[in-house]
Amino acid sequence: MKQLLCYLPWLLLLTLLVSPLNDARFVVEKNSLSVTSPESIKGTHDSAIGNFGIPQYGGSMAGTVVYPKENQKSCKEFSDFSISFKSQPGALPTFLLVDRGDCFFALKVWNAQKAGASAVLVADNVDEPLITMDTPEEDVSSAKYIENITIPSALVTKGFGEKLKKAISGGDMVNLNLDWREAVPHPDDRVEYELWTNSNDECGVKCDMLMEFVKDFKGAAQILEKGGFTQFRPHYITWYCPHAFTLSRQCKSQCINKGRYCAPDPEQDFSSGYDGKDVVVENLRQLCVYKVANETGKPWVWWDYVTDFQIRCPMKEKKYNKECADSVIKSLGIDSKKLDKCMGDPDADLDNPVLKEEQDAQVGKGSRGDVTILPTLVVNNRQYRGKLEKSAVLKALCSGFEETTEPAICLSTDVESNECLDNNGGCWQDKSANITACKDTFRGRVCECPTVDGVQFKGDGYSHCEPSGPGRCTINNGGCWHEERDGHAFSACVDKDSVKCECPPGFKGDGTKKCEDINECKEKKACQCPECSCKNTWGSYECSCSGDLLYIRDHDTCISKTGAQVRSAWAAVWLIMLSLGLAAAGAYLVYKYRLRQYMDSEIRAIMAQYMPLDSQPEIPNHVNDERA
């Protein structure tokens, strides 16, 4: 209950916002229906064109009316009743008459189409003026079949429906013509049309359908506009906040210019996500894109901006903002200063001329009713009814040309428009390598990073694309730095699976935009041995040695110019000779020492027989003593 009370002020505000629409003048778009037989009901009647399927604008269709005995409201599949309305070869198409009630109008037509009907007439069950059969509001399940409805449908009054049923039940063959040739005025050789749209991309099924239509129809719209065959103008529905609520939190979050211009909250949650005022500001920006582009004689640029903004700046990716919009504007070459001037200040307590004009245009004038349905397409001041789909809308536009003045596109199903020839379609391009991300398709140009010579470019396709994977260095050096001087070329591209730019040895920098030569001599990175003399070169260095020496780069040292192997051999020879010499000297010393020691002992032995030696103790001579 507390949560409900919090929302009561906003619910009251919504009531006040929509209350002016109660007096709105809604015009039901009609087509002519002529009964050719039987005579009892022969004549011309009005029918209301259904706002789905594909009405045959500019043409007519003849058929036989059938009223089923079962499933008369067409709320179930006719296959459940083993009923088929497929026409036999040579027979007129089948127009199925069904009753209103119990299910959506679109479901009735879908079930009839699956059973083989060529058109559907829905008989009203209320005695009232004709109304427009619209699609279900925000119904996901119905969206699956609505987009596949291709047959026309129309609502007839209760009284006329009863006449048709009575004639059929009486056994009469009821033949009639559905005529859309006058559904759209066709006074001259130029068609004027307008699309009431919205920049909100989170409002459900209808927003998805609208975005898809804009992307699909862009190519045809630009061909017609560039050829001067049409005059297109976009519009955006806005509301105002009653003066009593302008200071409320709800109005502040949903409105700009102090409550003058408002839009509903995209997520219907005032505490999170984007606010209604964000939508109003973007709507205003898109209106100003059209105005600025129209002043330069290129109003068709609006289609480029809207489709690019949808792709690049979606709400679900949190990119629905001015920064993303500015990047799209820049890529399309739109004057941002003129755009800002057109938008004005959304916080000012003043009327915004652009949005004020939009509010005034919502009110119907002449044969055109008030705009109350979003989206709404108006062709030659008549509201379009039917499926918002390229071929269907193109048929409606072509029916607005005076006879014999239709452009070639109306007489052919082929549409060719090479948008990449104008400003490269606003896509990324590398002029030096003649590579572009712009691809021209039937539905208009697409900005998609290309594959060149087997190398895949990656990026958003609008402002950035770079080669990736093996072989990427063969394409403009992989987007990395490269330079050539005096016959020497260096590149920072590393040919690996990952995208990488790395300055080569001898350079330093980011590898992408700049690599600077490293002064190995000044920074003492090489050639630092005592005998070395250093000289810096571009991307490298030169090192020389004093005297008869040779510089070894890997070891940063100087050696004799004689070959290393010869030097090693001589060193081995000298080592052997030195070893032999030392061995000989040692042997000689040992020999000399031993010989001397032997000779000393022999001499001492001889001398000891004749005289006492200093080292020999004196021995008494007992023989002489006895003789004495």
Curated annotation (Swiss-Prot):
Source organism, top-level taxon: Eukaryota
Transmembrane segments: 570-590
Leader peptide range in chain numbering: 1-24
Molecular function via GO: calcium ion binding
Listed InterPro entries: cEGF (IPR026823), EGF-like_Ca-bd_dom (IPR001881), EGF-like_dom (IPR000742), EGF_Ca-bd_CS (IPR018097), PA_dom_sf (IPR046450), PA_domain (IPR003137), VSR_TRX (IPR056858)
Assigned keywords, A-Z: Calcium, Cytoplasmic vesicle, Disulfide bond, EGF-like domain, Glycoprotein, Golgi apparatus, Membrane, Protein transport, Repeat, Signal, Transmembrane, Transmembrane helix, Transport
GO cellular component: clathrin-coated vesicle membrane; endosome; Golgi apparatus; Golgi cis cisterna; Golgi membrane; mitochondrion; trans-Golgi network
Glycosylation sites: N148, N294, N434
Tissues expressing this chain: Expressed in seeds, seedlings, roots, leaves, flowers and siliques.
Positions on the Lumenal side per record topology: 25-569
Cytoplasmic side: 591-628
Tyrosine-based internalization motif (motif): residue ranges: 610-613
Subcellular location: Membrane; Golgi apparatus membrane; Cytoplasmic vesicle, Clathrin-coated vesicle membrane; Prevacuolar compartment membrane
Membrane topology according to the record: Single-pass type I membrane protein
Domain EGF-like: 416-466, 469-516, 517-559
Domain named PA: residues: 56-168
Coiled coil: none
SMART domains per UniProt: EGF_CA (SM00179)
Pfam assignment, any one: VSR_TRX
Family: Belongs to the VSR (BP-80) family.
Domain characteristics, as noted in the entry: The tyrosine-based internalization signal may be involved in trafficking at the TGN.
Protein name: Vacuolar-sorting receptor 3
Native organism: Arabidopsis thaliana
